[in-house]
C-alpha cells in the first residue's frame, strides 16, 4: 500500500477517535475479546527537527485540601438497549448514583436518547436537574436538554448541530466541552441558563482539541488535555510516531488564564485527573488506539512519570479519584477477562472491590465524581421518561 494511502487511513481513524477518552464500552460475553496489542516502541518517538516543546512555568502547588463540606457523589452513565437484546427498538440513557453506605447503585434518571448521541451529562443536585446531550430520532447531532427531576419537565436548551464530549456542573454554573456547528474540535464553554447561550474559550480556534475536561478541586480550576488538529495530520504524527503531542494544563473559569503543567509525545495520553496536591493520574496508550490502556502517575513538581498498575487489572479505561486522595473509582478490565466493570480501589491497602449494578449494563459510557452542597439523598425518587409519559 502506498504511503499516501496509509496516511489517509490513519487520519480517518484519528478523526473518529479524537475524543477517545470518552469512548463507550461494549460489554461482550467472556468469549469475546477487546484487547488491542502493538509491537511498536512509543518511547522511540523523537521531536521533529526544529520543533520546540512548550515552555512549562514554575508550578506552585495549591495549599490545603478542597472543601470537605461538599457532598461527594459517584455517577456512572450507561446506555442500555430498550428491548434488552439489540438497538432495533432504540437505546436509553441511564444515570446511576453510588451509595457508599448501602454499597449499591441507584438509578436517578432514565430516558430514551437518539441513536447517534454521545450522552454527556451532569446533575445539579441542589435544584434536582439533570443536564444531558440527546437528539431527536432523525438527528445525527447533539443538543443540550434539561430534565427537572421533581416534575419530569424536559426542555431542549439549544438548537444547533453540536457534539458534546463533557458536561460539568460547578459552583452553580454549567460547563461543557463541545464542538459547535461547522467546527471540528471540542473546546470548553460556559452555558448561560438564562439566555441559553454558550461562551466559548476561543471561537476563532478550530485547531486545538480539548480532551479530558474535569474540575480540579485542589486548584479551583479546570484540568484539560490539549493537542493540535493540524499537528495530528502531519506526516510525522500520522505515519511515523502515531502519538499526538499533548499538554496537560489548568484553565480558570474565565478561560483566559492557562497554566501548562506537563507536555509529552513519548506516549498517548487519554484521560487525566488530579489525585492530590502534587499528583495527576492519567490513562495512557503506547500509541493512538494501540495497545492496552494503562494508568500512570505524574509528579507535577518533578515532572517524573511512573506506572501505577493496579494488581489484577489489565486495563483502566476511565477513572475518577475521590477527594480523600486514596480512593480510586474506575472502569477496568480484570486480568484474563473481556468484561468491563466498575471498581473501587484503595491506593494504600491495594484493596480492590467490584461495584455491582442492579442489572449488567449493555455499555458503560462514563464515570464522574461531583462535589456539591448536597447529593442523591436530596432527590425524591428517580425520574424515568418514557414514550407514554413520566413515571416516578
Residues covered by each model-derived region:
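C-terminal motif of bacterial Sec signal peptides marking the signal peptidase cleavage site
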Residues: 15-18
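Short coil/turn segments that connect the beta-strands within blades of beta-propeller domains
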Residues: 71-73, 126-128, 171-172, 219-221, ...
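Residue position within the beta-strands of beta-propeller blades
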Residues: 74-80, 131-133, 175-178, 222-226, ...
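An edge-strand/N-cap motif at the start of beta-rich repeat modules
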Residues: 44-106
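Repeated scaffold domains used in trafficking and secretory/extracellular systems
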Residues: 62-66, 115-123, 162-171, 207-218, ...
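Short loop/turn segments that connect beta-strands within beta-propeller blades
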Residues: 99-103, 148-152, 192-196, 252-256, ...
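Structural motif
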Residues: 82-96, 138-145, 183-190, 231-249, ...
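Surface loop/turn motifs at the tips and blade-to-blade linkers of beta-strand repeat domains
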Residues: 109-115, 157-161, 202-207, 261-266, ...
